[in-house]
Amino acid sequence: MAHVATEYVCFIDSDIVVEHGTLTRLRREFLDPAVAVAGPRILGLPLSPAAGSVAHYEAARSSLDLGSGPGRVAPATRVSYLPSAVLMARVAALGGGFDETMHVAEDVDLVWRVVAGGWSVRYVPQCSVRHDHRVEAMAWLERKAFYGTGADQLARRHGDLVAPLRLDPLCATAVGALVAQRRWSVPVAVIAAGAHLGLMAARAPSPQQRLATGANLTAMTLVATGWQFAGAATRHHWPLAAIAALVSRRARRGIVVAALAEGIADYRRVRPDLDPATYLLLHRADDLAYGLGVWAGALRGRSIRALLPVWTRPWRRGQASPTKTPQKEKTHGTQVV
């Protein structure tokens, strides 16, 4: 990039096949002077008849494929990063460009720095490229773990933006009580959920709609919190879940339910060309490898910041809104690439 003399630059990895019209379509985004970076959808190469299960899984669930929905890119949103496999950018907005000390997650870091600088970053799935995915089992698992190691570096540079969980304290208490499966679980959950409903209802703009608004927001936040708990137990925090499962029958039961429920829901959303059992096994292996990478990065960096949740404060927010999980559109929390 230091040698680029043009107004725009496009980074393209050597294992990418650019489809016709993609670069022209990306260039169109920069007619908006606020746009600094734009990226296309990254799909796999067409599958051969001999393609194995991992190839079919990656075709449906690659970490590089951010889905069919266009959108603004920013931390803790539906599209929280863009892979640097293909990026078009306005040179003046990039500053020093990629941090060359980072060998993983450098693309996430660049996008987040650009967004923090006040620029707009866009995901443009209307155009696409093809990527030569890793489809050998060990190479695939190693790459997933490698992605996970970047969480520690991002946490050092961007703090809570990389947090794997964003939790409302009251709803987290309610869901946590139910997960504990004790005699006091239901009363505690009811009290915590009722307190959240009261807070949301008190801030509804219309007195006539307070109860309905509060109930709707509380229900949405409880569901989102439950999915975050399931994702944490099977992805970022699975080592802790595994330890709990060794000593507690309730924990084992809860982890099995979480692993099955999250996997089945993901299968229904992705609709892969795989049978449910094979997809579920590969999905769990994907999460285990990524989580192992996150913990390896944390141990290497001697910091658990990338594993800590962020606690929201609903009583201090300007508007009542449900707690949302940033991935698993692709992943729970931020999927580091």
Regions found by a protein language model. Give the residues of each.
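Glycine-rich, basic loop-to-helix element that forms the pyrophosphate-binding segment
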Residues: 1-4, 70-74, 113
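Short, flexible, basic/aromatic active-site loop/helix in glycosyltransferases
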Residues: 40, 56-79
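Short aromatic/hydrophobic "clamp" motif used to bind/position activated sugar donors
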Residues: 9
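Actinobacteria-biased recognition of intrinsically disordered, low-complexity terminal regions
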Residues: 307-337
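The conserved acidic donor/metal-binding loop of glycosyltransferases
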Residues: 13-17
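Active-site-adjacent helix/loop segment of glycosyltransferases
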Residues: 124-125, 130-188, 199-296, 302, ...
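A short, conserved alpha-helix in the catalytic core of glycosyltransferases
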Residues: 83-87, 93-97, 101-127
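Conserved donor NDP-sugar-binding/catalytic core segment of glycosyltransferases
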Residues: 21-54, 132
